[in-house]
């Protein structure tokens, strides 16, 4: 229906759609519209966050976001190292003040075991430099596939270790 829009929620890379980046110009246009209409820009980093794209969050990559900072970032999956955990980050004092201790920001957030798993996971990612490693290994993977000359591979795309290979022929059976 008609009326004010509260928020725009987007993934910077459409993972389930085949690892399709939105593009920095699209994200900048969305930010502009959100600002004009006083709507929040929320970036869903459930699949792209916690280092998978070669940055802690995909929105931190200039090539994906055009330098846009969202109002809210949501994240899960990677932060718990296999244990269900989710969270959100809000930017700006006014918005952050709305989320006080005890506020419900995620189904799996706020439990002691999940928080411990997240702290341990983040510690390993940082100590072992896994964010930079994802960027380097992803580039190595994409360059290797692109240069192998196999006619089965039409294209390869991605950021960090979130990648897709487009095949020349559909594959109808499980890999």
Q: Predicted segment positions?
A:
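Conserved N-terminal phosphate-binding loop of PLP-dependent enzymes in the Aspartate aminotransferase
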Residues: 1-175
């Amino acid at each position: 229906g008609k009326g004010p829009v509260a928020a725009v929620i987007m993934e910077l890379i459409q993972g389930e759609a085949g690892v399709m980046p939105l593009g920095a110009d699209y994200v900048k246009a969305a930010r502009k519209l959100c600002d004009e209409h006083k709507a929040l820009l929320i970036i869903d980093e459930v699949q792209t966050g916690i280092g998978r794209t070669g940055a802690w969050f995909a929105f931190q990559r200039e090539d994906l976001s055009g330098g846009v900072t969202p109002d809210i970032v949501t994240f899960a999956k990677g932060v718990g190292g296999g244990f269900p955990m989710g969270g959100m980050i809000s930017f700006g004092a006014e918005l952050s003040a709305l989320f006080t201790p005890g506020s419900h920001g995620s189904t799996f957030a706020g439990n002691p075991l999940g928080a411990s798993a997240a702290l341990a996971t983040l510690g390993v990612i940082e100590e072992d430099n896994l964010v930079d490693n994802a960027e380097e290994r992803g580039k190595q993977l994409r360059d290797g596939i692109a240069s192998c000359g196999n006619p089965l591979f039409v294209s390869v795309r991605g950021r960090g270790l979130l990648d897709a290979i487009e095949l020349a022929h559909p594959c109808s059976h499980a890999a």
